[in-house]
Amino acid sequence: MRSVSLRGLEAEARERLDHAVYDFFAGAAEDETTMRANEAAYARIGLVPRVLRGCGAPELGVSLLGRRLETPVLVAPTAFHRLAHPDGECATARACAAAGTVMIAAMASTVPIAEIVAAGRERAPDSPAPWFQLYIQPDLDFTGAIVGRAEAAGCGALVLSADSPALGHRERDLRNAFHDLPDGLRCENMRAPGPGAVQARPRSFQFSPELSWAHMDWLRER
């Protein structure tokens, strides 16, 4: 049966995906209190229609950072899409391009950012380019190289994740012994820069409580 809602897609994913993979996508840190609170907060939001306005067909499009979007709903960054689909983030980019909205590509993508951007352009050349999520790494030279790749790929913006001074204590992942990607999958954007970058083993993510406004100044100036 074809899913017609987000809840339906979630149920279908639970049936199709490996249990540990589903828990990775569906889970959060500790007791998942914040995740449940977020869902409850969104559920309390109501859309109150205006009546007798004579406005014709509704128009959902918006202008964002100088680009036209067909919907004000963006796709947030999520890691490791190839765990769920063989084309990984490229499939997500094509879907977002077809919908006329922005995909925010995760720094922990299983496809290089240049290929993600190219996949969206191939599907819909005039669609808004993906944005790139960034975790500033302690090695600022390496971080700068990652930002340079996103710029060269044509990303429309950087989305800085500043709320992760440490890796979350994800209890579902711990129970499932989900500590790393399976063989053949890598965080492609974390490869070392240089001529041998494609062959180089990706670096591990590093989270630091040292992140401050000084890092924002560095990012703006580079």
Tell where the protein language model's regions lie, with residue ranges.
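Short, acidic/turn-prone active-site loops that include or flank metal/cofactor-
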Residues: 109-111, 134-138, 164
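An N-cap/entry alpha-helix motif that binds or orients negatively charged groups
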Residues: 1-69, 170, 177-211
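Alpha/beta enzyme core
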Residues: 80, 93-94, 119, 123-127, ...
